[in-house]
UniProtKB/Swiss-Prot annotation:
Identification of the protein by name: Myo-inositol transporter 2
Stretches with biased composition (Basic and acidic residues): 42-58
Extracellular side, ranges: 126-152, 201-209, 262-269, 381-396, 445-465, 528-533
Membrane-side (Cytoplasmic) residue stretches: 1-104, 174-179, 231-240, 291-359, 418-423, 487-506, 555-609
Extra remark: Present with 468 molecules/cell in log phase SD medium.
UniProt xrefs under Pfam families: Sugar_tr
Keywords per UniProt: Cell membrane, Glycoprotein, Membrane, Transmembrane, Transmembrane helix, Transport
Entry's localization field: Cell membrane
Molecular-function GO term, any one: myo-inositol transmembrane transporter activity
Organism: Saccharomyces cerevisiae (strain ATCC 204508 / S288c) (Baker's yeast)
Length: 609
């Protein structure tokens, strides 16, 4: 083992000498001096802080606490190219390999990202079409108008189904694969849609929504996970946001189709039927596309893992690909347990007993809960009902404006999330949402809405200028939501180390769907019992408290490596330390990008051992 490690070190240093003439390893020993040429190809750092010396003795380790965490820049009297070496952040011998692919994103990665993001589109289309369908169903189910309670049950059925499957989706993805799980979610969408299209009874419609919810729960968890595992770290945040873009795009298209089919007989059935198109497309594409390299390594299929990496990074040498696969294999073996069940329970234990993991869980679940209990999904599910209530005849047209705003500001978040930072856009978005919700609550008070019994017929004083105020500030609310809390929670995979990531993201996603279930099944009841003013005041209060939570508990993670995230959370939330570190990392990344003229900002990829 010693000879193998030494040989690996010599090979790594020789490769670095070729690519980076002024390379110095992380312990400050051994600089290679050749010509000053640089490349835009692949970058491989082999960190050897604890490498055995000539006498066979290991040097003393220097664990780095959060307060003393440093980023050590290479020192060279002649030239400083801006690259950095991360010191070890744990008490283990650090023999990890750092691999960065400094090149343009390949068409293969773009293809995988967009195909996986179709799940986000289906998720968004589901939340969008039901709003229009609830308005146009009329007496098509059981030959009677749906009550508020029945509307809530139809809507909440999807959230219940998503909650059930999201709990075990992470483990299923480890056992069966990410791609098969997404294809299974397509089958659930297919069955659920067919049941709804042919429904003439309330129970069949609810059953179809429940089964479709199974697919939504799987897709909402696996799609971001799939993208994060195939994306280069230098643009991982932005590629993950593409899933959110597809989600908001699905909502926008659903509202547009709903507006067009609003007065067509059985138009809501056509609206549901259109959801079959992306379902069939994703299933068909995945018949010809591979799974992620990490999954293939987990199953011991190293040949396929190498194949996917080669197609993803077309200009990368075979030696670097081989080294990457070896590190992924070593990481997989570091997860305790010999079978999936044992590994699952060990991961659950580590998630709750390791302080940094538990803080990550608090943040991940907290953000997903905030996303639901600030009321956005209730607006998406029942926007048609809300806008009819305030006097708008073509409520679907107004819903298009709201969902269009959501899409545009999600697109803005796509460009800002890695540059401005996750924490900053959250602390802009949540206060903005709070103000908008407070104004909506006040406007509802002066509008004077009166509910007429327990059915879906609402008596109001008619349209007034307060209705305009409500619409305007719901649009403002949508903009601030999309910019921050609508996007950041789905970056949850970066919070957790690899050995608990599947379980951690399952917990967080399940929290999202549990919140969605509660809101979807109680929103119309809240409107009746505590009035729209009370309902929107509740959402405003949650948004206000959420701002405080994010201010004190959400560190800045933009630009940080996975090891750095765990160090930040090791003995607290360490907001100041995270902001300082993120700022320094961004400066050094910018300097490195300017020096090497890269198309994308390079970010080192640290594979945890």
């Amino acid at each position: 083992m010693k000879n193998s490690t030494a040989a690996s070190s010599r090979w790594t240093k020789s490769r670095l000498s070729h690519f980076f003439p002024s390379y110095t390893n992380s312990s400050g020993m051994g600089a290679a001096s050749t010509d000053q040429s640089s490349t835009q190809g692949e970058e491989l750092h082999h960190r050897k802080h604890c490498e055995e010396d000539n006498d066979g003795q290991k040097p003393k380790k220097s664990p780095v606490s959060t307060s003393t965490m440093q980023i050590k820049s290479r020192q060279d009297e002649d030239e400083d190219d801006g690259r950095i070496v991360i010191k070890p952040v744990n008490d283990e011998d650090d023999t990890s390999v750092i691999i960065t692919f400094n090149q343009s994103i390949s068409p293969f990665i773009i293809t995988l990202t967009f195909v996986a993001s179709i799940s986000g589109f289906m998720f968004g289309y589901d939340t969008g079409y039901i709003s229009s369908a609830l308005i146009s169903i009329n007496r098509d189910l059981d030959n009677k108008v749906l009550t508020y309670g029945e509307k809530e049950l139809i809507t909440a059925a999807t959230s219940l189904g998503a909650l059930i499957t999201s709990v075990g989706a992470g483990t299923a993805a480890d056992v069966f694969g990410r791609r098969p799980c997404l294809m299974f979610s397509n089958l659930m969408f297919l069955i659920g849609a067919i049941l709804q299209i042919t429904a003439h009874k309330f129970w069949q419609m609810a059953a179809g929504r429940l089964i479709m919810g199974f697919g939504v729960g799987i897709g909402s968890l696996i799609s971001p996970l799939f993208i994060s595992e195939i994306a280069p770290k230098m643009i991982r945040g932005r590629l993950t946001v593409i899933n959110s873009l597809w989600l908001t795009g699905g909502q926008l298209i659903a509202y547009g189709c709903g507006a067009g089919l609003n007065h067509v007989k059985n138009g809501w059935r056509i609206l549901v039927g259109l959801s079959l198109i992306p379902t069939v497309l994703q299933f068909s594409f995945f018949c010809f596309l591979p799974d992620t390299p990490r999954y293939y390594v987990m199953k011991g299929d190293l040949k396929r893992a190498k194949m996917v990496l080669k197609r993803s990074y077309v200009n990368t040498e075979d030696e670097i690909i081989d080294q990457k696969v070896e590190e992924l294999s070593s990481l997989n073996q570091s997860i305790p347990g010999k079978n999936p069940i044992t590994k699952f329970w060990n991961m659950v234990k580590e998630l709750h007993t390791v302080p940094s993991n538990f803080r990550a869980l608090i943040i991940g679940c907290g953000l997903q809960a905030i996303q639901q209990f600030t009321g956005w999904n209730s607006l998406m599910y029942f926007s048609g009902t809300i806008f009819e209530t305030v006097g708008f005849k073509n409520s679907s047209a107004v819903s298009i404006i709201v969902s269009g705003t959501n899409f545009v500001f999600t697109l803005i978040a796509f460009f800002c999330i890695d540059k401005i930072g996750r924490r900053y856009i959250l602390l802009i978005g949540l206060p903005g949402m709070t103000v908008a919700l407070v104004i909506c609550a006040i406007a509802f008070h002066f509008l004077g809405i009166k509910f007429n019994g327990a059915d879906a017929v609402v008596a109001s004083d008619g349209f007034s200028s307060w209705g305009i105020v409500i619409i305007v500030f719901i649009i403002v609310y949508a903009a601030f939501y999309a910019l921050g809390i609508g996007t950041v929670p789905w970056q949850q995979s970066e919070l957790f180390p690899q050995n608990v990531r599947g379980v951690g993201t399952s917990y967080a996603t399940a929290t999202n769907w549990a919140g969605s279930l509660v809101i979807a099944s109680t929103f119309l009841t809240m409107l009746q019992n505590i009035t729209p003013t009370g309902t929107f005041s509740f959402f405003a209060g949650v948004a206000c408290l959420s701002t405080i939570f994010c201010y004190f508990c959400y560190p800045e993670l933009s630009g940080l490596e996975l090891e750095e995230v765990q160090t930040i959370l090791k003995d607290g939330f360490n907001i100041k330390a995270s902001k300082a570190l993120a700022k320094k990392r961004k400066q050094q990344v910018a300097e490195g990008a300017a020096h090497h003229k890269l198309k994308f900002e390079p970010t080192q990829e640290i594979v945890e051992s």
